[in-house]
Design a protein with these regions (language model features):
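Glycan-recognition and catalytic cores of secretory/periplasmic carbohydrate-active enzymes
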Residues: 2, 6-268
Length: 268
């Protein structure tokens, strides 16, 4: 890091600099310099490598294809959409799971992109079948908290996991906004609210992976890195996709939780 009279600079991972010049009142003005072509090249490599993976209709595929969906939306490269569409159509033709789980609902994220980009009804139908499952059939406990499920069996009775925020709550929120469904939005925010209450340590600000409502404990009690990533990412997205988010009381809990978590991660 180097300092000067008007700014300081930080080298980024792509070899450019982060500059923070002073504003008119002497305050810092954020400015990020980066090599767009280099970043797009990295995105391109990741997309192509991901599409060469043998993934099935479950959460790893859902997370990976959410990334490809986002790459398409951010870059506008139709090639990414075509790759995604071809693979999803292939998986649909091979046959979808007979029973949905919370984990399998992660595939709903790429279905949103495909439906919005193509208008093809089959993507909307499958997406809404996942939402119907989450609303009516998914196991819940306490104040309608989703139990994390990985199969048709009741593998983890009355357990909530951070994973559910990405696989289900974030999906419900996105679909609720897309469909102008306030009941679904409220349900999604309720999931955020209770996962915060159950999984975030109020003393440290960090998140546990899971909570067992029957035993009344956090099982291993560790601050799992990926669990904190599920929480941080999904909470960071709420304000950007929920219109007039400040009108929803539970959003205040989401924003506060995220701030506390990021402050904790900064010094952890």
């Amino acid at each position: 890091m180097s300092f000067s009279d008007d700014c300081f600079t930080i080298k980024t991972t792509v070899g450019k600099e982060y500059k923070e010049p002073k504003g008119r009142n002497g305050g810092a003005m954020l400015k990020l310099e980066y090599d767009k072509k280099e970043i797009e090249g990295v995105i391109d490599k990741i997309v192509k490598k991901t599409m060469n993976m043998d993934l099935t209709w479950d959460w790893p595929c859902g997370v990976a294809y959410y990334g490809i969906s986002d790459a398409y939306e951010k870059t506008g490269k139709k090639e990414y959409l075509d790759l995604l569409k071809d693979r999803i159509d292939e998986l649909i033709d091979l046959g979808l799971p007979k029973v949905w789980t919370v984990n399998a609902c992660a595939m709903g994220h790429c279905l949103i992109t495909l439906y919005q980009a193509t208008g093809e009804q089959q993507y909307h139908d499958i997406l809404m079948s996942k939402i119907a499952y989450l609303r009516k059939d998914a196991l819940r406990f306490g104040d309608h908290v989703l139990q994390h499920t990985v199969s048709a069996n009741n593998d983890f009775p009355e357990q909530c996991w951070c994973d559910t925020l990405f696989m289900a709550a974030f999906l419900m929120l996105r679909v609720g906004v897309m469909e102008h469904d306030e009941e679904l939005i409220d349900d999604a925010l309720n999931q955020y609210y209770w996962h915060i209450k159950y999984l975030q340590n109020p003393s440290s600000g960090l998140w546990y992976h899971g909570y067992d409502n029957i035993a009344g404990d956090h099982m291993s009690g560790i601050y799992w890195g990926r669990a904190n990533a599920w929480a941080a990412f999904t909470m960071s997205q709420v304000g950007g996709i929920l219109p007039q988010c400040y009108l929803y009381p539970k959003y205040i809990d989401v924003a506060g939780s995220l701030n506390e978590q990021l402050a904790a991660l900064k010094v952890y």
